[in-house]
């Protein structure tokens, strides 16, 4: 069995308008400012998995700073896991310093995600 264990996917709105998030999310801009940095959705991911013989992918979003954005993205991950049940394994993502981190973890676990996908410290000085 082949499992891709670190896969970010993004909702259509984020893929089509990544620049909208650059002002408030500097870590996102740092990683995705270039148009060469591909943003894929769940449909594109599963198609690529089929083409490459990947059985399962562990998916998550991005550790957004803003609560509204990470909730929207985690909702997308939960929806993708339901849509491609058995193929996609979902983890939640958020800024670990956000005051809603604990409640978001609980919400995502209750929604079928299996844990936390990434604690990103891109700009914190922690390495």
Pin down the residues of each PLM region.
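An N-terminally biased module of ancient metal coordination in phosphate/nucleic-acid-related enzymes
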Residues: 1-60, 68, 109
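Active-site gating/metal-coordination segments in enzymes
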Residues: 55-56, 64-127
């Amino acid at each position: 069995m082949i499992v891709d264990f670190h896969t970010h996917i993004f909702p259509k709105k984020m893929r089509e308008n990544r620049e909208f998030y650059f002002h408030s999310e500097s870590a996102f801009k740092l990683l995705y400012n270039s148009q060469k940095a591909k943003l894929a959705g769940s449909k594109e991911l599963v198609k690529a998995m089929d083409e490459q013989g990947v059985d399962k992918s562990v998916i998550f979003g991005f550790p957004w700073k803003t609560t509204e954005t990470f909730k929207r993205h985690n909702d997308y991950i939960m929806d993708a896991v339901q849509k491609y049940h058995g193929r996609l394994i979902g983890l939640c993502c958020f800024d670990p310093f956000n005051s809603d981190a604990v409640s978001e973890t609980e919400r995502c676990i209750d929604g079928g995600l299996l844990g936390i996908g990434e604690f990103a410290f891109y700009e914190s000085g922690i390495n």
